[in-house]
């Protein structure tokens, strides 16, 4: 059942992104990009809070992070819990507690886990978010795909070479490393394979 839900969720995300394919009118691309917002007040304030509460109780904090930050990488979730509990490092016990809470949240149907990312099951909306210290490994394929799609809606077409730079700038990267470009291109390849975009003579366009 969980796998069916994940597929439905992924398909809904894809459909939602491409329902938005309508021409932007007077809206500028930069107006569609939002500042990355971190979850605060997640209900855990100390080490005792984390380790004395049941997985179901800690799951409420995971839900809050997912609601504010989803899609969010698990390592970011661990960091939020660590910081909220004023712990110096994310040791094995903390990771075990967080992973147990993630499982409880998944079982309750509040969070959907796809790969290393957590999604709020109540929302199919994926925003393009600008980060202060972006790391491409911590950005989901869905958010990268949404970024590519919105660029192509606004610009109509773009050279394959310049696309990674445009995408990375929207995420807050000041320069585009090879690793970042490779990840963006891998998502572009998936979009081409899915018939969502086409690549012709090095020019990328929406299908």
Identify the residue ranges that each predicted region occupies.
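A conserved SF2-helicase RecA2
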Residues: 1-2
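C-terminal non-catalytic scaffold/interaction domains in large multidomain proteins
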Residues: 7-207
């Amino acid at each position: 059942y969980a796998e069916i839900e994940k597929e439905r969720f992924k398909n809904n995300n894809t459909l939602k992104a491409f329902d938005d394919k309508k021409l932007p009118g007077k809206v500028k691309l930069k107006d569609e990009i939002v500042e990355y917002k971190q979850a605060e007040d997640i209900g855990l304030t100390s080490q005792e809070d984390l380790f004395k509460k049941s997985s179901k109780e800690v799951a409420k904090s995971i839900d809050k992070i997912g609601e504010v930050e989803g899609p969010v990488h698990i390592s970011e979730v661990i960091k939020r819990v660590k910081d909220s509990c004023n712990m110096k490092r994310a040791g094995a016990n903390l990771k075990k507690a967080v992973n147990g809470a993630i499982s409880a949240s998944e079982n309750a149907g509040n969070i959907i886990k796809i790969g290393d990312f957590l999604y709020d099951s109540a929302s199919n909306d994926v925003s393009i978010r600008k980060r202060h210290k972006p790391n491409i490994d911590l950005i989901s394929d869905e958010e990268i795909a949404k970024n590519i799609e919105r660029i192509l809606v606004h610009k109509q077409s773009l050279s394959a070479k310049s696309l990674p730079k445009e995408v990375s700038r929207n995420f807050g990267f000041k320069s585009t490393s090879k690793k970042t470009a490779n990840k963006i291109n891998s998502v572009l390849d998936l979009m081409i394979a899915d018939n969502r975009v086409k690549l012709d003579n090095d020019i990328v366009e929406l299908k």
